[in-house]
Amino acid sequence: MIITIDALLDAAQLNKIQSSLQTAEFIDGRATAGWHAQLVKQNQQLSRTSTLAKSLQEIVQTALQNNALFEAAAYPQRVHSLLFSRYEPGMEYGRHVDNALMGSGDRRDRADLSFTLFLSDPDRYIGGALVIEGACDEQAYRLPAGSLLLYPSSTLHRVDPVEQGYRFACVGWVQSWIRDPAKRELLFDLDTARRSLFTREGKSIEFDLLSKTYANLLRRWSE
């Protein structure tokens, strides 16, 4: 399941991040890639531990926590490993799959879902599409600044070469309460249906039955 969340950031949040990134110091993005992804990763990123990165991470984390669609689609247990990246002309991130586990030592988080928060409007750069491969085809995304794409970490994906301009983005990962993507999609559909029913009919018998089923499936499947 791939979800687009329009305008995750409000104007003030987006402006704060964009203005901060314009003058930020970036490092080689290969530092955080897996050994095989390093071969195809050509971009720059903020150091995760820098004061600026931490302050911008807080803005994004707050926006995610306050977004009902993100909560309903991801069932986030932990949102982790946020990175702010920059692509200059000629840079790309070739075909790869994200690491299943991230972190080191005793603290490792599972990557069930990945997200890309676009921080540059599409008319500010040429190329640089995020391309997600499926079994039979592939889909390319270039969303407005402030919008987010949420997709399974199990997919093969890439960022096409930037031909002109600069592409800024924030990427991150989610360890979900619902590990199985098929179960997660069933819960999302069921929750969407019961909320739609409530909007039309209020707290009906049918709504209560759907809510009972939803709650008990969530109780059974969460981990």
From Swiss-Prot:
One of its GO terms (molecular function) is 2-oxoglutarate-dependent dioxygenase activity. Residues 78-176 form the Fe2OG dioxygenase domain. Its EC number is 1.14.11.-. Keywords: Dioxygenase, Iron, Metal-binding, Oxidoreductase, Vitamin C. 2-oxoglutarate binds at R167. Binds 1 Fe(2+) ion per subunit. One of its GO terms (biological process) is intracellular iron ion homeostasis. Its cofactor is Fe(2+); L-ascorbate. Gene3D superfamilies: q2cbj1_9rhob like domain, Rabenosyn, Rab binding domain. It holds the Pfam family 2OG-FeII_Oxy_3. The keyword Iron applies. PANTHER family: PKHD-TYPE HYDROXYLASE YBIX. HAMAP family: Hydroxyl_YbiX. This is PKHD-type hydroxylase Synpcc7942_0015. It comes from Synechococcus elongatus (strain ATCC 33912 / PCC 7942 / FACHB-805) (Anacystis nidulans R2). The lineage of its organism: Bacteria, Bacillati, Cyanobacteriota, Cyanophyceae, Synechococcales.
